[in-house]
Each structure stands twice: as C-alpha cells, then as structure tokens.
C-alpha cells in the first residue's frame, strides 16, 4: 500500500514523498490512517527555516522523526487518525499519536492514545499544546492565592490560563500585544489585562 509524507528537503522547501508501506496483522502494532495532521506554528517554523542550533538537536528530536535538522527531515508530532488495521478490539478507534505528517503509518499500540467520546475530533489537535500547559502548571507549583500573569495568547498561553481557571485559581491574568485577542479571553472567561498596564498589576 502507498503512503505519503511531508519532508523538508531544505530550508523552507517542503516536498511530498511516496513510499510503499507493508503491514502484517499482529497483536503489537496497528495501521493508522491520518484524519488530521497539525503543524506547530512555533516549533515547526524553526525546523523549516533551519534555525535549530546543533546543541539542541537531541532535545528537539520528535519521537518518530526521520532525517536530521540539517535536512532532509520528516518532522511533526500532532496526528489525529483512525486505526484501519490491527487487533479487532482497536479497529475504527480514533487516535492521537506523536507522529509526523504522513497519510498512513504503522505504529506500536503502546505509542497510540485511543480517543474517547464523540463530537468534533479536530479538538484533539490541541493535545500536545495541552500537555505543555499542564507541564507549565506543574513547574510553577503555584498556590491558589498567587497572582499569575500569562504573557502571550497563542494556543499554549490560552490553554494554560484556562487550565488554571478550571482548577479554581482566582488571580490569573492573561495579556497579549494584540489587543484584538481580548475577545477570546472574554469568551473563555479569562481576565485580560492590557499589555501596557502590566506594571500596574500589583
């Protein structure tokens, strides 16, 4: 069977590669068909432009990366798909995997997150960002009465602020130099503060 993957041949030079993929049914691996593949705007922009320094190559490596940051490289880690081959109990299950941009791939079942629930599964493209938000929460070790300011309303910033809100933190503020993003804070019930007034937060 054929599979197609996105590679960066050189700086900002993406290409599509075709490959013949073989799969023999077994109890340990499954075949996943990609439904949605997300691009990390920050990380993958750095990778595509060749701006990963050599001392960061090992740290920045994604789990199923092929090639190197010196190019060519197949990179990515936000994949929402469906199991199309494998043990019967997993068939047709929706999945999230830390896999690059590829139409069809085989993977060890231990590296697959089975998605539960109904609704629009595109929301699971934010899974990697949500993990980062939770790690931020753990690393800060904040107390409920602490005053917290989150700078930047990208996906990670918004998810981090919202996670604090879910955990009943009352003094959480978020800001961004783009004042138009205030409307998103309002929708989520987050406390937006004008970037120019940060000094007055205390």
Mark where each language-model region is.
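A structural motif shared across PLP-dependent enzymes of the aminotransferase-like
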Residues: 96-111
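Short amphipathic alpha-helix with an adjacent loop that forms part of the alpha/beta core around
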Residues: 196-202
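Short loop/helix-cap segments at secondary-structure boundaries that form the rim of catalytic
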Residues: 90-91, 105-109, 182-187
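Extreme N-terminal starter segment of soluble prokaryotic enzymes
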Residues: 1-5
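Glycine-rich beta-strand-centered segment in the early N-terminal region that forms part
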Residues: 23-39, 47-100
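Mid-domain Rossmann-like dinucleotide-binding core that forms the NAD(H)/NADP(H) cofactor-binding site
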Residues: 119-195
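Glycine/charged-rich beta-loop-alpha catalytic/anionic-binding loops adjacent to active sites
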Residues: 110-121
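Residue-level recognition of beta-strand termini and adjacent short loop/turns
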Residues: 9-12, 26
């Amino acid at each position: 069977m054929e599979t197609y993957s996105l590679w960066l041949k050189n700086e900002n030079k993406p290409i599509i590669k075709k490959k013949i993929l073989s799969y023999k049914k077994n109890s340990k691996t499954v075949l996943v068909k990609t439904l949605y593949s997300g691009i990390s705007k920050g990380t993958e922009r750095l990778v595509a432009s060749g701006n990963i320094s050599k001392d960061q190559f090992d740290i920045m490596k994604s789990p199923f990366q092929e090639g190197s940051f010196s190019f060519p490289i197949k990179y990515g880690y936000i994949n929402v798909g469906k199991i199309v081959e494998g043990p019967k109990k997993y068939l047709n299950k929706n999945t999230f995997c830390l896999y690059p941009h590829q139409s069809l791939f085989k993977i060890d079942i231990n590296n697959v997150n089975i998605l539960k629930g109904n609704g629009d599964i595109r929301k699971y493209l934010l899974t990697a960002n949500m993990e980062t938000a939770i790690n931020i929460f753990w690393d800060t070790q904040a107390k409920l009465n602490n005053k917290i300011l989150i700078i930047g309303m990208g996906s990670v910033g918004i998810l981090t602020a919202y996670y604090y809100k879910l955990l009943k933190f009352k003094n959480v503020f978020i800001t961004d130099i783009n004042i138009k993003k205030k409307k998103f804070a309002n929708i989520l019930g987050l406390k937006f503060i004008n970037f120019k007034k940060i000094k007055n937060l205390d």
